Every structure is written in C-alpha cells, then in structure tokens.
UniProtKB/Swiss-Prot annotation:
It catalyses: D-erythro-1-(imidazol-4-yl)glycerol 3-phosphate = 3-(imidazol-4-yl)-2-oxopropyl phosphate + H2O. GO terms for cellular component: cytoplasm. Transmembrane segments: none annotated. InterPro entries: IGPD_sf, ImidazoleglycerolP_deHydtase, ImidazoleglycerP_deHydtase_CS, Ribosomal_Su5_D2-typ_SF. Belongs to the imidazoleglycerol-phosphate dehydratase family. Coiled coil: none annotated. Pfam families: IGPD. Its EC number is 4.2.1.19. This is Imidazoleglycerol-phosphate dehydratase. One of its GO terms (biological process) is L-histidine biosynthetic process. It comes from the Bacteria.
Length: 195
C-alpha cells in the first residue's frame, strides 16, 4: 500500500499527518479548526484516501499557521506516498456541484509546484473561519506535494458551498491522479522518463 506519515514541529505548530492512497475514505481529524476538519473529511471521502491529522497550533493568535502547516505536511505525505510515480495516471480533474455552486479542480502530479486559485468567496468568513486560509492551505500543499493545481469556482452564492465543492472536487481529482493505470503500472507517466 502507498502510505506515508509526516510530523512537522515548529514554534507555531505541532502536526502529525498520515495518508493511505489506497484507503477507504476514512478520516480521523483533530486539527483544532472544526471547519478545516470538515473540509479535510471531504478530501478523504471523495478521494477514497485514508487521512489522519492531529495538530496543535497557536490558535490563540488565529488559524493561519495551523491551516498552512497542515497543508505543508499533507503535501509532504502525498509526495512520499506516491514515491517514484510509476504507473499513476498523473492527471486528475473533477467538476463538483453543490446546489447553486460549481467548482472545477485540475491536477498534474508533475513534480513542479504551481497553484492557480480562481475563486472569489461571497463572504470573508465561514463561521469563524477566514476564507483566505483556503488558498493558504492549497499553496502549502502544492509547494510540498510538487504538483500543479488549478482551482476554479465557476458559480456560487454561498461561501460554505463554494469551499465544500472545491474540497470535494480536489478529493475526486486527486483520486483520479494517484490511481494506478494497469496498462502502464511500471512506467513513469512522462516522455522524460522522470517526474
């Protein structure tokens, strides 16, 4: 099985994450940020990835460091779990609606970090969660997973729906990208021969 665990300790956060790419969509989440836990659960469930996250952060300041550092640690774990990338589909995409909302996510496990985040949330906060932290999470993830990620919210009036459809689409696109293609299970999915 393709699994990895990462521990990241800084003066701001103490985080341990574990990922199983060949899981059943189970999640054990204790980030200290309830809305983030709800979003991470979407990745696990829709990505069919088992995900464990335990974090303690400087939440007395705000959730920024915790959210960003969880993104970093999860990106590192994904990069380790996919290893040399032999046999993976490499690319993944998903359109996910949620009532009035529609989001598109496209992934390339290219070895080159890049994020295009095209979303204008209808509110600045969801409950007490600053929506700017969603982009911070994905930026940390992308930088350490070494992936190209395009996120586009194509329609939406409810900020919670916008966020949730993005995370669901990300989970489904990631599931597609990390799936092993049985026709090329011993090949790197690149004409360069390396990713």
């Amino acid at each position: 099985m393709r699994k990895a665990q990462v521990t990241r300790n800084t003066q701001e956060t103490q985080i341990t994450v574990a990922i199983n790419l060949d899981g059943q969509g189970k999640a054990e989440l204790d980030s200290g940020v309830p809305f983030l836990d709800h979003m991470l659960d979407q990745i696990a469930r829709h990505g069919m990835i088992d995900l464990n996250v335990a974090a303690k952060g400087d939440l007395h300041i705000d959730a920024h460091h915790t959210v960003e550092d969880i993104g970093i640690a999860l990106g590192q774990a994904l990069n380790r779990a996919i290893g040399d990338k032999k046999g993976i589909f490499r690319y993944g995409h998903a359109y996910v609606p949620l009532d009035e909302t529609l989001s598109r996510v496209v992934i390339d496990l290219s070895g080159r970090p890049g994020l295009q985040f095209n979303t204008t949330f209808t509110r600045a906060v969801i409950g007490s969660f600053d929506v700017d932290l969603i982009q911070e999470f994905f930026q940390g993830f992308v930088n350490h997973a070494m992936m190209t990620l395009h996120i586009d919210n194509l329609a939406g009036k409810n900020a919670h729906h916008q966020a949730e459809s993005i995370f669901k689409a990300f989970g489904r696109a990631l599931r597609m990208a990390v799936t092993i293609d049985p026709r090329c299970d011993d090949l790197i999915p690149s004409t360069k021969g390396v990713l």
